[in-house]
Amino acid sequence: MSIPLPIRTSDGTGNLSSSPPKSNGLPRLSPSPSFVQKHSPRSSDTSGLRRSASHHNARQTFKQRRCKSQYPRDSPERHVEFILVASFHIDRGPIMEHQYPGPISSDEGMLAELMLPDQTHVRSQDWTIFFLPLDTGGEGEEDDLAGENNKRKGKRNRVRSSSGDEGTSADTNNESEVTEEEESSDEEDGGEGPPLMYVLNLVNTKQDNTVKRGAVVKAMAICTRHSFLHIYKPILLLALEDYFKNPYPETLETLYNAVNAMDLSPMPKLNLLERQILQATNSKDMFIEKFEQMVQQRAIEDGENDIDEDNPPSPRRGTAPRYTLPRDTHEFESKIIYNDIPIPVKVPTVIWPEIVGDFSLVKLIQIFSAPHAASPQPFPLHPHLTTSGPLTHPIIVLVNAMLTQKRVVFLGHNRPSGEVAEAVLAACALASGGILRGFTRHAFPYTDLTKIDDLLRVPGFIAGVTNPTFANHPEWWDVLCDLPTGRIKISNHIEPAPVTDGQLYFQQQSPVSASGPNADPTGDNLFMEDVLRSIANRYGENAIRAKWRAYITKFTRVAAAFEETVYGASNIYIIGPNEELSPDSPSGLQSDPGDPTTIRGHGYVWPDEASKQRELMASVSRIEGWRTTRSYYSFIQDIAAMYWPSRPIQKPDLHHHHDRLRTLKLSAYEAGAIYLAFAHAIKDYAGICQLLTVTPESQAGLFYLSMGLLHPDRNVREATADLLERIALHPAGRHFWAQLNRFAKTAYFRIKREKEAAGNSSPIVKSPSDSFGPQQSLVGVAISGVHSQGS
């Protein structure tokens, strides 16, 4: 039996078990003076193989709470809601043939037109994606709401009835699970209206000389609530081919039953912080412990009680167990059985808002970057769009247009409709960064001239078209992205940016001019150079998405600083306890000298005040333009709803003070205050998760934190070492410890040796609040990892 995790209650205190920890059977090893000298640089690396001691400890920890599934077996929600078939009739035009298992919409003509794009007869195959709002109806919506409320009440009642025998700790644990589930549900709902139905559509054209015009055109679509609808492409190819041979509802029934029989229940449900950590890392076994626990739970449910807990199923073994661990925890591997044909599918473990389908940010960036690099063309100036002058990078112009809710059209003349749809989806992900919402709900991955009136009634739409007529009507759009030429145009009919309080504020201030003609106060030029350099160096899609997520995160933090500077407070940032609203509040001071965690400071960090003023002045129009959009108001809702899940530690502001370590030249006293505050505040699982979200691998990981091991104050060095030990024993933190450089690890072991020699404390973690599994020193973890690699 492993040590219970400390559970953070609503008041920020830890609820710890007082039961003594038990040994895991491994020898307790103390750091020896010869260890650092004799072992190779990988001797202190805990990454190793999955059977390392740190991995065993982390997996044991998760047995304290049952791991939930993202898609439970008993869930009433189906993977696929509807299957549609349309065809082109020579006399009647696009017509609907079937809607299975029932009609999704009474407007069959509109659906048929969406499923059969323009010029589809000139291509043998084409893919399109479009969205439909799921009309649940008023009465059904009330029933669904009542059912959800009853479900939550029932869960609370079960918690209360089961907590009587388990004491306060169990009650707090279970109540936190209920709250977490409700917050996750609220996050998925989004509060933007009825849920969207994502439609993946395949169009096939088969030559047939026996019919008029010599071809038969049919389209089949799958309607799902899952945004990862691209996984259904292989089975849709097979099903449409079968439908050409057997055009009957039975063919659709076979497809419907096959896709809904797909088992995704072994996929664990990660909380918000865990999803952020997984998305930002390249480690293929991050949170593998949760997948192992799901396999064990399913084996117990299925009656397979003889499973070896120390050796769960692995995809590398010769036998083929029913449930296997994924090769990469970023994706869950399952299969769909269609007509006795197993079709493998990979479902993303982490799903962010506005991320729909399978697209490539790399491809989108390359399309519009290459012509600009070869022959730059100046844009007409617009305060919301050209934040770096007339030669602002086209991708930045596109992102600015979407952030400020401009009408954006992607034109792909003589291109497949699937290509323009992919560009629209990539643009939504680009501007969202997985953080902001409000783009896909107003996106039209493919549309045509017949729907122009409906399109123009949507403010700030993002549309994909193939008809060149759109290029000749600049009054229909604000920004036109021409895919064949790779050029972006700003319409001469675009509305001018209004004068705002923010602009007046900075005009009244003493001017802070940029130094030199090539100055980049917003940092956008430097950022795009970094992105293009990463693409040229073959960085993967995940790395580029992580960079854009960091860019949008920075944008929201700069916007919060702008609001505090101009308006005195921000709508998009919640300050922690004992913090002052004034933007001039000095950072680094402690409101309570006896509590290191009361160190003040919040928000984005600039190297100096002049840099801050230059960037805010350069970004004022873009920020003010964003503050009037639906994505801004959705972000305010998200900040309020996700405050507790994303910030289990309210004080200090971990992101702000870690940025101070990265950006500023701090004195020994100032840096020591940060290290002590972190060591005192970060004690439990959730706190370490929060820290890891602000120390991603792409930004040096734990490097700046490890510099506390070299601090001149002994107390700071020891506190930093204790914090790193807690991180190394954390299921996700062990990966960050493994990537820490040899120099920092040498300093860590030196501090542990000094503590042992002085007799002040043992190098073994003793407190339950400092441990995430059976007790073991970090040296033992490192040596066990070496033995595992050697075996």
Curated annotation (Swiss-Prot):
Cellular compartments annotated: Cytoplasm, Cell cortex
Residue span(s) of domain uDENN: 81-321
Disulfide bonding pattern of the chain: none
Compositional bias annotation for Basic residues: 52-68
UniProt KW Membrane keyword: no
All residue ranges annotated as the cDENN domain in the record: 361-506
Domain dDENN: 508-613
Regions of compositional bias (Polar residues) in chain numbering: 10-22, 31-49
Predominant location category: cytoplasm
Location of region: Disordered: 1-75, 138-196, 302-325, 581-601
GO cellular component term, pick one: plasma membrane
Family assignment from sequence similarity: Belongs to the AFI1/mesA family.
The protein's name in its UniProt record: Protein mesA
Organism from which the protein derives: Emericella nidulans (strain FGSC A4 / ATCC 38163 / CBS 112.46 / NRRL 194 / M139)
Gene this chain is encoded by: mesA
